[in-house]
Amino acid sequence: MCDSKDNSGVSEKCGKKFTNYPLNTTPTSLNYNLPEISKKFYNLKNKYSRNGYGLSKTEFPSSIENCPSNEYSIMYDNKDPRFLIRFLLDDGRYIIADRDDGEVFDEAPTYLDNNNHPIISRHYTGEERQKFEQVGSGDYITGEQFFQFYTQNKTRVLSNCRALDSRTILLSTAKIFPIYPPASETQLTAFVNSSFYAAAIPQLPQTSLLENIPEPTSLDDSGVLPKDAVRAVKGSALLPCIIVHDPNLNNSDKMKFNTYYLLEYKEYWHQLWSQIIPAHQTVKIQERTGISEVVQNSMIEDLNMYIGADFGMYFYLRSSGFKEQITRGLNRPLSQTPTQLGERVEEMEYYNSNDLDVRYVKHALAREFTLKRVNGEIVKNWVAVDYRMAGIQSYPNAPITNPLTLTKHTIIRCENSYDGHIFKTPLIFKNGEVIVKTNEELIPKINQ
């Protein structure tokens, strides 16, 4: 842990400077510009009284109006300071999470008095009452930066008053009073960052180029299996641990040791089949692409998102507040349909019009998503094979003069109505050429 004199000064124990993220800034990608308050767990103190019930252990407050006297000792005696990280949402608001238990601040719907709500500790769900706007400015005398937290309706701010129990009611809401010069009520609603712990954040990988479809080198060369295929990193995103289900870690351990998870998006050429087709012969081959329902459900459970029928990303409530940052980092679009991508099974008839036997290997583009912990351990990965981008390589590729011809195409099964596209036949596969097809059906657009 490091201590700091103020928000922009030198860390006394660490001997290095750190800069606070400017307040009221436009949303930015988690990948490249994490604000300081999203990279550290800060202990918060009140600006004027310097007490921080449950948020810091400091001197007894000398005078606090509108707080019952029996709450003074509770605030003073608490020796369990809280260290809080603020996860930046797409809209510029924050989720305030506790390093100790992995829970987040939640504005409970019940009332205390004067239309004020208790702020409780709760598991993250993505609801509006867990989102807070941080606003503030600097003290022109001391240069110290302080701030308030606005609640969802922007008519209340977080207050240190009414903190009755360190694990039930953390804070409460209060009316908005001028932050400077301070009203007496502002003593408990204006906060400053104090000492901190660094968050556990993984390194982002460099992107790379996708290689050409691999070629067979002999009739006996069946090609590269999917598990051995060369991957190209096309994007990556940092996922706040509050949206990730890690079967091996509880919320507290996730927050401390994997504050952010790494989600990598890779592409590779997925072998669909490899076969020697005799001269002037037709063969039937079954091809399986897309993604299974079991794999989609796994992605929903662990990431609260899935791959749409248009191969874009679809987000549920828990992850939707971060969807712009995630898709920007992954270099993937938002899905324009609520329909999930399903598994597609087709029967193809191919004709070899050459005068010699030929080894043909067909590949389709695979889109792979891998979830990793800070230490690089893989939690899980999900693969969707895109039937719309495919190509065939052959051996020998000379002296053959005639390409492989798709003479008949039948869909055996497709798990959603948007996978019903049939290739027009005959379709010529030139050696090494990638055929790109898109659905002819109009997929209805939605607003995520």
UniProtKB/Swiss-Prot annotation:
<comment type="similarity">
    <text>Belongs to the toxin_10 family.</text>
</comment>
<comment type="function">
    <text>Component of a binary toxin active against Culex and some Aedes mosquito larvae. This subunit is responsible for localized binding to specific regions of the host larval gut. The individual subunits are not toxic. BinAB and this subunit alone bind to the gastric caecum and posterior midgut of C.quinquefasciatus larvae. Binary toxin internalization into host gut cells requires both proteins. Does not bind to the midgut of Aedes aegypti. Toxic to Aedes atropalpus mosquito larvae; mortality towards both C.quinquefasciatus and A.atropalpus is maximal by 48 hours.</text>
</comment>
<feature type="disulfide bond">
    <location>
        <begin position="67"/>
        <end position="161"/>
    </location>
</feature>
<keyword id="KW-0800">Toxin</keyword>
<keyword id="KW-1015">Disulfide bond</keyword>
<dbReference type="GO" id="GO:0090729">
    <property type="term" value="F:toxin activity"/>
</dbReference>
<dbReference type="GO" id="GO:0030435">
    <property type="term" value="P:sporulation resulting in formation of a cellular spore"/>
</dbReference>
<keyword id="KW-0749">Sporulation</keyword>
<comment type="subunit">
    <text>Forms a heterodimer with BinA.</text>
</comment>
<keyword id="KW-0843">Virulence</keyword>
<feature type="region of interest" description="Probable pore-forming domain">
    <location>
        <begin position="226"/>
        <end position="407"/>
    </location>
</feature>
<protein>
    <recommendedName>
        <fullName>Binary larvicide subunit BinB</fullName>
    </recommendedName>
</protein>
<feature type="region of interest" description="Beta-trefoil domain">
    <location>
        <begin position="19"/>
        <end position="200"/>
    </location>
</feature>
